[in-house]
Amino acid sequence: MRSKELIILADSSPDSVVEKAIKMGLKVAAVDQSVKERLKGYLDPSLIVEVSEWPSEGELTLFKIRGPEDVEILRREANERKFLIESESWKIIPLENIIAEVGGERIYAIADDLEEARSLLGVLEIGVKGVVIPIKDSAQLERALRLSEEVNPLNLREARVTEVKQVGMGDRVCVDTTSILSKGEGMLVGGSASFLFLVHSENIESPFTSPREFRVNAGAVSNYLLAPGGKTLYLSEVRAGSEVLAVSVDGRRRAVSVGRAKVERRPMVLVRASSDGEEGWTVLQLAETIPLVKPDGSTVAVTDLKPGDRVLVYVSERKARHFGTAVDEFIEER
């Protein structure tokens, strides 16, 4: 699944929204020269996507489609530069024609709203490479970030288990969602917010228990849990009504609501692992029904886990957290 870009159109968005978008990791596009200059006054220019109108060439070339002859021009030129498409009437059909001919890797489109953005990102199941969209307020910006998460998978990677150690009794949290979790779906949890383990849901059949397709036994109350917007929650904070991320083995993610957080005292096990020089750990309940996920998508129960086994993890570039939000500062967790 190739990555997609959701870019904020600065020309039609308040400066406060533009600044917040940058902090959330979204790019900003500017078409009007005065807007470009204003943004350069308080933003790093590298964060601004330069847009130039056809036939001038910028990071993105704005091209207006008025009729079939314009589609023909795009077919000829699309391999030479990245185009930002603006259509005065029909949007989907012209883009379908372009994507069918040249693919969507160098094609971007202007969307009027988030629903249209979602449609454009999925044209012919390939979709455009990115959408440029005006955002009016913080609520819209949050929804835009959710959409960006939906269409961009997390980069899960392989980690080698280095230690499995029983650590006595502790309080663990079962996160019961209001959704049915599919095979291969679970949640990302860990003792460090920058190194999270994929814990599979309890939707696997066993001789002794019925499956709980809505549940992830996420471990100790002190564990971090990945939530929408790139934020984390302590498991102790999760309760009915919280929103968390369900993550699949291929990195796809979706927001799900919590119907209940079930805290009970159980025997616990510490699992440590390393990946490309990074180290992390998690504390989970010691039981046959708590599975981690292997790189091939199969599962391994924590009761069967041993040093040398390989499991899937997510390692974040940003290490520090302030009330669950990633920040760029030094922090050491151990």
From Swiss-Prot:
GO biological process, one term: amino acid biosynthetic process
E.C. number: 1.4.1.24
Catalytic activity: 2-amino-2,3,7-trideoxy-D-lyxo-hept-6-ulosonate + NAD(+) + H2O = 3-dehydroquinate + NH4(+) + NADH + H(+)
Pfam families hit by this protein: DHQS
Domain of life: Archaea
HAMAP family: Arch_DHQ_synthase
Entry similarity comment: Belongs to the archaeal-type DHQ synthase family.
Primary role: Catalyzes the oxidative deamination and cyclization of 2-amino-3,7-dideoxy-D-threo-hept-6-ulosonic acid (ADH) to yield 3-dehydroquinate (DHQ), which is fed into the canonical shikimic pathway of aromatic amino acid biosynthesis.
Protein name, entry field: 3-dehydroquinate synthase
Highest classification ranks of the organism: Archaea, Thermoproteota, Candidatus Korarchaeia, Candidatus Korarchaeales, Candidatus Korarchaeaceae
Gene name for this UniProt entry: aroB'
